[in-house]
A protein has these predicted regions:
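ABC ATPase NBD coupling module
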Residues: 26, 77-93, 117, 122-123, ...
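Helix-to-loop junction immediately C-terminal to a conserved catalytic motif
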Residues: 60
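Conserved ABC transporter NBD signature motif
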Residues: 68-76
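Conserved ABC ATPase "signature" region
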Residues: 76, 112, 116, 123-140
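Conserved signature/switch motifs of ABC ATPase nucleotide-binding domains
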Residues: 144-147, 165
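Catalytic Walker B motif of ABC-type/P-loop ATPase nucleotide-binding domains
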Residues: 170-173
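A short, surface-exposed alpha-helical micro-motif characterized by mixed small hydrophobic
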Residues: 212-214
Length: 356
């Protein structure tokens, strides 16, 4: 990175971006606004039809929004000529779910191609392509054709190709969905390294919560063509506010209770037990919060379910507890959890005689 690159603090800025396709009854994008910080990793999540791919196509200029403003690397796209837009797009690489490598070209040839389109001499393009293939872990695979490469290797070639013209932004659209879990993790590790070593801004579209938690700095939740929630990874994943965010994250954090317990739960207090879900993160995940509660207040607790996981390098854990319902004891528990930075949610009340 040079001084000019470091001077740019915002990679992409979108304001009130809207797009409606001909014949559609509702907009694909409805006044979408966001600031994508430079040199960070951003994940856009949402259900199918939320508008994610349309937004991506607007960011790489494959679609033109009906209204709103789009600024890329401090340049207002609407003020640029077609030629200037083409030059700007050299700094924006796109990786698709289908890698779209040219079957008749080797890995080296595929990575050289974008440079050759810009008139880069073959010798220079070849050296640059070899450097990039080495950077993505494909030294020795330069002469392999796409059919001779695994899915993960083809995706690595696609990443190298996207960086061929020294792209400062990588747009990735469901790029791991066709890969097995281990290969996906390997590709995510590669992207983290590229972000760290090259300072590349990465914007991901994904439905895979594993992708989100592994590498994201910021998360954006889309519904009906708008961002309904956005913020830093831990803020969004550990403290979701919008119902759509909670729905998307349910499979990541919420371990299902047995049906016989769920069916017996009451939303209002009853004589019996109260069930509480706890979410530990950061410092609280390493403290004896439950042991301290029992010592301080002598409350009988049963652990019904538990799980440990991680967000990037941060550990978090979930527990589902059962305790005899008493308003005074419940208030003491909730105060104790809040004091120690533990997110506590009352799941419901289990009538006396129902087994937990």
């Amino acid at each position: 990175m040079n001084a000019d690159d470091l001077a740019i603090t915002v990679a992409i800025n979108i304001t009130d971006l809207s797009k409606t396709y001909p014949g559609a009854t509702c907009p694909a994008l409805d006044k979408v606004s966001a600031v994508f910080e430079a040199r960070k990793i951003h994940s856009i999540i949402g259900l199918s039809g939320a508008g994610k791919s349309t937004l991506m196509r607007c960011l790489n200029l494959l679609e033109r929004p009906d209204s709103g403003h789009l600024t890329i690397l401090d340049k207002d796209v609407s003020m640029l000529s077609c030629l200037e837009q083409r030059h700007l797009l050299c700094q924006v690489g796109t990786i698709f779910q289908s890698v779209n490598l040219l079957a008749r070209l080797t890995a080296l040839g595929n990575v050289m191609l974008p440079q050759q389109w810009l008139g880069v001499p073959a010798k220079t393009a070849c050296l640059r392509a070899k450097e990039l293939l080495a950077q993505v872990g494909l030294t020795g695979f330069e002469d392999r054709y796409p059919a001779q490469l695994s899915g993960g290797q083809r995706q690595r070639v696609a990443i190298a190709r996207a960086l061929a013209n020294e792209a400062k932004i990588l747009l990735c659209d469901e790029f791991t969905s066709a890969l097995d879990p281990q290969t996906s993790l390997d590709i995510l590790a590669l992207l983290k390294n590229l972000n760290r070593d090259l300072g590349v801004t990465i914007i991901l579209i994904t439905h895979d919560m594993t992708v989100v938690r592994e590498i994201s700095d910021f998360v954006y939740v889309m519904e009906h063509g708008s961002f309904v929630e956005q913020g830093e990874l831990e803020q969004i994943l550990l403290h979701p506010q919008h119902p759509m965010t909670k729905k998307l994250l349910a499979s990541l954090f919420e371990k299902e209770l047995p049906n016989h317990i769920k069916d017996s739960l009451s939303e209002t207090p009853v004589v019996g037990d109260v069930l509480i879900r706890l979410l530990f993160s950061g410092k609280s995940s390493q403290e004896p919060v439950i042991a301290d509660l029992i010592k301080a207040h002598g409350i009988d607790l049963s652990i019904l379910a538990g799980n440990m996981d991680h967000l990037r390098q941060s550990v978090f854990g979930t527990l589902v507890l059962s305790a005899p319902y008493d308003l005074g004891s419940l208030e003491k528990m909730m105060t104790h959890f809040h004091k120690h930075g533990v997110v506590a949610e009352i799941l419901g009340y289990l009538p006396k005689g129902e087994s937990a």
